[in-house]
Amino acid sequence: MVPEQAERHYRGEAGQRYHREKRAVPDAAIPWVARLRAEKLAPHLRPSDTILEYGAGLGWNLARLDCRRKLAFDLEDFLPPSIRAAGVQFVPDATAIAAATVDAAVCHHALEHIMQPAAALEEMRRLLRPDGKLLLFVPFERERKYRRFDPAEPHHHLYSWNVQTLGNLVQECGFRVAQAATGRFGYDRFAAVWAVKLRLGEPGFRALRRLLLTLKPAREVRLVATRP
């Protein structure tokens, strides 16, 4: 997926720490986040689909989806028991999956971490059946903080795209781009932590997240493509 030098951020204790400090939410909020992600992905999927998430992290994106088979690939196997219980199967090596056996590949805020994004997209294309879907999401990084270099920056992003350049990359990797746009995204972890602390429940989590997105909008690039 990435050369050893870049992998160090996501393996072993460093990987556990990265997910704990940058991605983890309180256990009580995992279903809230999982439902939010399912609402985002479900319109593109069918109950009969086999789906693979490439760079699945903690597995929230797949947990609440109604699909026949849910596969999660990442560099390290630390899916929470609750995610495994939701029927998500961890796959330690995506190259071991037979070609043309997946109906949809999800890559949600992972491509920007990968040293060779074109190679990752080509691997996803190999796994997809003809007319299979690629659901790709990356940050739309335009904030002031990105105008300078910070050697201690904690997110480890290696690339940044806009709608045009991401579409160009996906097209060059042999996909047909069906949709490409930006959309609101972010504050899931912050809203989850405070909703649990303040005992606001899932409605409070969603309301707090909407408020934050209104006050300080953050966006992502969203792209849907198919394999010819």
Question: Can you say where each PLM-predicted feature lies in the sequence?
Answer:
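Short glycine-centered segments of the SAM/dcSAM-binding site in methyltransferase folds
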Residues: 50, 131-133
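S-adenosyl-L-methionine-dependent methyltransferase catalytic module, highlighting the catalytic core
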Residues: 5, 18, 24-28, 115-123, ...
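Conserved N-terminal segment of class I S-adenosyl-L-methionine
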Residues: 1-98, 104-108, 121, 181-183, ...
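Helix-to-beta-strand junctions that scaffold the AdoMet/dcAdoMet cofactor pocket
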Residues: 46, 114-115, 128-130
